Amino acid sequence: MPGWLAVPRDWLASLGEIARFCGRTMGLVYSGRVLQFFGEALRQAGILITGSALVIWGLVFILGLSSCGIEAAYLNRSLGAPAYAGVFSAWCDLREVVPYAFGYMMSAKVGTGIVAELGAMRISDEIDALEVMGVPPMVFLAATRLLAAWMVFPFLFLSSVGIAFFASWLAVVKQIGDVSSGGYFLIFWMFQNPPDLLFSLIKGMAISTAIVLVGCYYGYTASGGPVGVGTATAKSMVLNIVLVHVISMMGTLVFWGANPRAPIGG
């Protein structure tokens, strides 16, 4: 095989290994085998809440305040339609900013943390010790973390959306004051509906699931000592950032590409 095909071949091989690992992990959750370690899943869920919630909420508050609040208010003022600042809050926060911010922080905080923890266990032979003791490591280490993510992330995502909405309202109504609270919410709810919230939640859960699975894969398969764990952490971060953009783009195209669900036109 020509040398220039070596890199694409290695990439495809790695993607195949990741896909197989993800399929096995999800199968362990769907089959119910992970329930034998439900206590560990609850422990991981608690770690996710206490270690990530405030960081994610803080990020979406800042983005909702600035990107979807202040900028939207001044843009609408320049267009002569300050009363329509709620449009940007309804669309910007829910459809794009919160899913992207959620994915970025999950990649940087949760994904890399999983790689570092599992990688340290791998190079110190703790995973091999689990096998010797008769504990299935894939179930105990990977499937429990995925189940914990599915228990926690819907709450984290929906609460993040609410915080972003509050931040945008705070910027538009209280800080800039171009529109009253009643006028703001009139337009805000005209451009938003329950299916949009469901679609955004699906995007967020797809992104979160991919991040956790990638983190588990790179941590579980780490090798080469501390340097290898660092390399695996960097690889997981790069892949997760790519997946955040790809999944969010595909979600936007599927859910709103053909029908933006906007009360405009005839």
Where are the language model's segments positioned?
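Hydrophobic alpha-helical segments of membrane proteins
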Residues: 53-65, 69, 150, 154, ...
